[in-house]
Amino acid sequence: MRIQLLWLSFAVLSTILSTCDATSDKLDPQRVQPNQNGSGHNQSIRSALKTSHGKTIADDEERFISLSGMSEKIAKYYKAIVAKLSKYFRDYHERREIRKQRILNKSFAEMMAGQKSVEDIGRNQDASFMSSSFLWTPEAFKSILHKYALFLYKYGNGHLATVPVKTG
């Protein structure tokens, strides 16, 4: 069981990296392949979630499952972890984009009201966007590790209960 959990851990972490690549492809307009009308927009979710190797996340999942020889039970847990973490990263990016839009709207309102100059807003925007542009913030990483450790404890029949996880 422990060997299978180690394989599961490796597979999940590898798939997370693929998910990060796919998410950055989706958000970076220069790396997104244009659709039939050439605009690059209105892509299907499946094509937007392509990894850097041109395969989808689901293809990577199946590849890991077949190469590792995971049992059906462990494969089910693996898919559940990947689905939850993929959803977390999508939600994280959506929240980050909403935050950027709010900052822009607030700055525009301050500029129109004459409270700040264009130069002041430019300096603040650079700092705000730099601080929000990193995917692996300490809080996000701690949260992922904590949830992952709880998952392993729950489905590992308590074998990993002694693994220390710092959450603060």
Swiss-Prot record:
The lineage of its organism: Eukaryota, Sar, Stramenopiles, Oomycota, Peronosporales. It comes from Plasmopara halstedii (Downy mildew of sunflower). It comes from the Eukaryota. Residues 78-107 form the IQ domain. Its main location: secreted. Secreted effector that suppresses pattern-triggered immunity (PTI) in plant host. Glycans are attached at N37, N42, N105. This is Secreted RxLR effector protein RXLR-C06. Keywords: Glycoprotein, Host Golgi apparatus, Secreted, Signal, Virulence. The RxLR-dEER motif acts to carry the protein into the host cell cytoplasm through binding to cell surface phosphatidylinositol-3-phosphate. Induction: Expression is up-regulated in spores. A motif (RxLR-dEER) lies at residues 46-63. One of its GO terms (cellular component) is extracellular region. Belongs to the RxLR effector family. The gene is RXLR-C06.
